[in-house]
Amino acid sequence: MTITPSLKGFFIGLLSGAVVLGLTFAVLIAISQIDKVQRSL
């Protein structure tokens, strides 16, 4: 039973890391898209 808390924390860390990575990629893509639009104007 001592394994479950560490596993829970591990999964929470993985999830938060994935969310942070996803947000970072979304921001980078948005910035590049905005840059393209501004250059085409």
From Swiss-Prot:
Presence of the UniProt keyword Repeat in the record: no
Lumenal side: 2-6
Keyword tags: Membrane, Photosynthesis, Photosystem II, Thylakoid, Transmembrane, Transmembrane helix
A GO BP annotation: photosynthesis
TM ranges: 7-29
Keyword rRNA-binding among UniProt keywords: no
Subunit structure: PSII is composed of 1 copy each of membrane proteins PsbA, PsbB, PsbC, PsbD, PsbE, PsbF, PsbH, PsbI, PsbJ, PsbK, PsbL, PsbM, PsbT, PsbX, PsbY, PsbZ, Psb30/Ycf12, peripheral proteins PsbO, CyanoQ (PsbQ), PsbU, PsbV and a large number of cofactors. It forms dimeric complexes. Part of a photosystem II (PSII) assembly intermediate complex PSII-I; crystallized from a strain deleted of psbJ, it forms monomeric PSII before addition of the oxygen evolving complex. PSII-I includes 3 assembly factors not found in mature PSII (Psb27, Psb28 and Psb34).
Record gene name: psbX
Gene Ontology cellular component terms for the protein in this record: photosystem II; plasma membrane-derived thylakoid membrane
Function, in words: Involved in the binding and/or turnover of quinones at the Q(B) site of photosystem II (PSII). PSII is a light-driven water plastoquinone oxidoreductase, using light energy to abstract electrons from H(2)O, generating a proton gradient subsequently used for ATP formation.
Cofactor binding remark: PSII binds multiple chlorophylls, carotenoids and specific lipids.
HAMAP family xrefs: PSII_PsbX_1
Matching InterPro entries: PSII_PsbX, PSII_PsbX_type_1_subfam
Localisation per UniProt entry: Cellular thylakoid membrane
Entry membrane topology: Single-pass membrane protein
Primary location class: membrane
Annotated protein name in UniProt: Photosystem II reaction center protein X
Family, as annotated: Belongs to the PsbX family. Type 1 subfamily.
Cytoplasmic-side segments: 30-41
UniProt superkingdom: Bacteria
